Amino acid sequence: MLGNLGENLTKTMKKLVGISVIDKKTIEEVVKEIQRALIQSDVNIALVLDLSKKIKKRALEEEPPKGITPREHVITIIYEEMVNLLGGEAPGLDIDVKPYKILFLGLQGSGKTTTIGKLCRYLQKKGFNPAVVCTDTWRPAAYEQLRQLTEEMQVPLYGDPDNKDALDLAQKGLKEFKNRKVIIFDTAGRHKQEEDLIAEMDTLDDIIQPTESILVIDGTIGQQAGEQAKAFSQATDVGSIIITKLDGSAKGGGAMSAVAETGAPIKFIGTGERIDDFELFDPARFISRLLGMGDIQTLIEKAEDSIDEDMAEKTMKNMMSGKFTLVDMKNQFEMMNSMGPMQQVLSMIPGLGNKVSKEASKMTEDKIDGYKVIMSSMTKKEMENPKLIKQSRIRRIAMGAGVEESEVRDLLKYYNNTKKTMKGIGKRGRFGNNSMNRMMGQFMK
């Protein structure tokens, strides 16, 4: 996420941990490296210099609290000041009235419609049943795109591609979904100079009387995100911001810091192309991940939202007891996939996230996908009892999956190593870092 920003900041933190004496020279070197990393991520230079000044001043003048080493104190200062740079407090989403009406705003191409789909999925996971109203009469494919998104998730949609009156659509949508807990209104993509659209937006605001107006901003535009946020705030009451496309953007840090500077809270961030690559923004957790400190709480929440509890319990029981089969291993892969891209999940594990490169993570994901294809060519008996798989079966499975026989053997080797590792953990009754490293190491080979 955010290009190489996380990787560069983690390297700086590691260097700081390895330094024996924390003096003025050390602090200045660390601050310079932080400056370099942030400027490369398109963070405004004035903001970077202000952050640097605060870190330097606190690091040189503050006495570490009792029981905290000078090194730990400097790391804490860097963490706290970077959290402040991104707005400090996590805004959260409180659905406290019925109907809770959300008005979506944004420029064309910002990812607004896709983000509506992601928010619907997020709300469904939290126990809400949202409905969507399409008032975008300017873009020909707007209704059709929303229809496809909402149909997949069984979210009710109101719209009429033949009706070119956005205000009429909004009124009818309100009537249609008056008993719904959450109603989301999609609007036409705007440009800050488009006076007709801005006027329409003001009238829509009067008709809908939204509980919250959310502005969607493309994270790849960097510092310009701040100007967008200001322009929209002047035209209407923007309650919060969603920043999209942060998974591969080298300018994402610039976008986030520029928006935070306007005072508009960042409520959600889009972290990938999948419908589940979307999370409530918490500056403290986010910076913790960027600095390589992990984010266990978000990892737990992701697991709770994504994983079938009964399946997970059964798989873990089999793993620990030594009854681990290829069925269990396939379930394990499905659970891993459901939590999102591997690089993103690893970034939440303290000390592990930035040890594994993007390339290695991608290779691992590709290897898992390959293993799943191979397993789909196996019979139920073979999946439940892999000991049955001898040379003749290996040949048949390889032909069915369209792979080399060596790839089938590679899968069986990984399975046997995993079974052996998990059986050993079951006997010892604990799961340590070495066990995790051994399992990850098998994939990274």
Swiss-Prot record:
PANTHER family from the UniProt entry: SIGNAL RECOGNITION PARTICLE 54K PROTEIN SRP54, SIGNAL RECOGNITION PARTICLE SUBUNIT SRP54
Superkingdom to which the source organism belongs: Archaea
Binding site for GTP: 106-113, 186-190, 244-247
Name of the protein described by the UniProt record: Signal recognition particle 54 kDa protein
Stored Gene3D superfamilies: P-loop containing nucleotide triphosphate hydrolases, Signal recognition particle SRP54, nucleotide-binding domain, Signal recognition particle, SRP54 subunit, M-domain
Family note: Belongs to the GTP-binding SRP family. SRP54 subfamily.
Described purpose of this protein according to its UniProt entry: Involved in targeting and insertion of nascent membrane proteins into the cytoplasmic membrane. Binds to the hydrophobic signal sequence of the ribosome-nascent chain (RNC) as it emerges from the ribosomes. The SRP-RNC complex is then targeted to the cytoplasmic membrane where it interacts with the SRP receptor FtsY.
Subcellular location: Cytoplasm
Assigned GO CC terms: signal recognition particle
EC number: 3.6.5.4
Catalytic activity field: GTP + H2O = GDP + phosphate + H(+)
Quaternary organization: Part of the signal recognition particle protein translocation system, which is composed of SRP and FtsY. Archaeal SRP consists of a 7S RNA molecule of 300 nucleotides and two protein subunits: SRP54 and SRP19.
